[in-house]
Amino acid sequence: MIGYLQGSLAGVRKQSGRLLLLLDVQGVGYEVQTPARSLVELPAAGQSLQVFTHLQVREDQWLLFGFLQMAERDLFRQLISVSGIGPQLGLALLDSLSLAELVQAIVAGNTRLLSRTPGVGAKTAERLALELRSKLAEWREEAGLLPSATAAPIAAVQEDVEMTLLALGYNNREILQALTAIAQENLVQSGQPAEDWIREAIAWLSR
């Protein structure tokens, strides 16, 4: 098993919507697929780069997947352990939400949020939550991904908040960022009604 690769970034290209890195490790070029969002964090060509890797062995080919953080690689492995979640869908999930947001959605059983990822239907989202909820609740403590105690409105309120903000034109990432920020700033408490969360979220997003 290849745990990580460290070398110089020889090139980056996109193929069929996939982000592929060419990593030069002591004269050997490794092609590594990585989450698309990693593009903004990559160094310039020729600069040093370390990626934590997952090797998938098929009958016809070996595929390397690379991640800039070990926690991201470990979460990817958890995702693809679920029936119906292949590597490409695992990467799509990692691209749709931040690490902490994705783990929180699974632990909280927020299947509505999970199913917004292209390719993830309601049944797949339910399977993710069912199979990984307890595992990730424990794992995120070790990985340091614990949310704050007031990181989101209670489940009964969250759907109303999200639907209202989506209708106003905000996207999923903006909504999650706003809800997390106003909770961390103690502008709203978990048990307050949807109207309070919506008002503060709009104010935060308008800054």
Swiss-Prot record:
Question: Is DNA-binding given among the entry's keywords?
Answer: yes
Main location group: cytoplasm
Determine the domain of life of the protein's source.
Bacteria
Per the record, which residues fall in region Flexible linker? 148-158
Looking up Pfam families in the UniProt record yields: HHH_5, RuvA_C, RuvA_N
Taxonomic classification, please?
Bacteria, Bacillati, Cyanobacteriota, Cyanophyceae, Synechococcales
Q: Keyword set for this entry? A: Cytoplasm, DNA damage, DNA recombination, DNA repair, DNA-binding
Q: What does this protein do?
A: The RuvA-RuvB-RuvC complex processes Holliday junction (HJ) DNA during genetic recombination and DNA repair, while the RuvA-RuvB complex plays an important role in the rescue of blocked DNA replication forks via replication fork reversal (RFR). RuvA specifically binds to HJ cruciform DNA, conferring on it an open structure. The RuvB hexamer acts as an ATP-dependent pump, pulling dsDNA into and through the RuvAB complex. HJ branch migration allows RuvC to scan DNA until it finds its consensus sequence, where it cleaves and resolves the cruciform DNA.
- InterPro entries assigned: DNA_helicase_Holl-junc_RuvA_I, Hlx-hairpin-Hlx_DNA-bd_motif, NA-bd_OB-fold, RuvA, RuvA_2-like, RuvA_C, RuvA_C_sf
Which GO CC annotations does the UniProt entry carry?
Answer: cytoplasm; Holliday junction helicase complex; Holliday junction resolvase complex
Query: What's a Gene Ontology MF term here?
Result: four-way junction DNA binding
- Region feature Domain II, mapped onto this chain: 69-147
What this protein is called in its record is Holliday junction branch migration complex subunit RuvA
